[in-house]
């Protein structure tokens, strides 16, 4: 098995294919949160802020595209900005720290680079990110949470950044929300946010992903298959009974009666 980027996943699959070795790939993501106008706005903003800042956004299944129904777009954005501004950045073992550094200097430059590329390509800066300074941690690879908005064709909306950056866009109705959520090369995880459970089930069933959540995100339940489709992997189950089947093979033995 391999967990990592789609680019390296292709190389692993190619090498395994040359020797007919089965391989399971769990690759990147560009998850969407589809947020309807009957949602509890403060609660949704809080949970999605937690999702995007958990592990400093270095989670392949997190929601990095926030699709908000137009009728509540401004209210949701304001709530999300206020919530993200309150995130305490600091040493991972520090008291009160809610978000630590990214994993390396390379990743630090990658996150900042995508913010620059996104704005250069026309994205609106809703919440300015950038490097963060933490007292007593000079040289640490800290970044601030950031929100961009605009066309979903923007590079920051299409490519995996792997940092605390979300991209905002609005939609009019249910069908458009589903279409925008699925309009990506990735297929790891999406979520739907609404007080209407029937709508949530209907929308989630149309996600082109291996995983979906209702009024939550990044909640992993052991025993439930976890995997991606499209550019996010080759399906199958992780942390579930299906995982054990990777270590078994079937053999048919037939005898005359």
Language-model region placement:
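N-terminal Rossmann-like NAD(P) cofactor-binding module of classical short-chain dehydrogenase/reductase
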Residues: 1
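ALDH superfamily catalytic-core signature
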Residues: 4-152, 214
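Conserved C-terminal structural/oligomerization subdomain of aldehyde/semialdehyde dehydrogenase
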Residues: 34, 88, 138-257
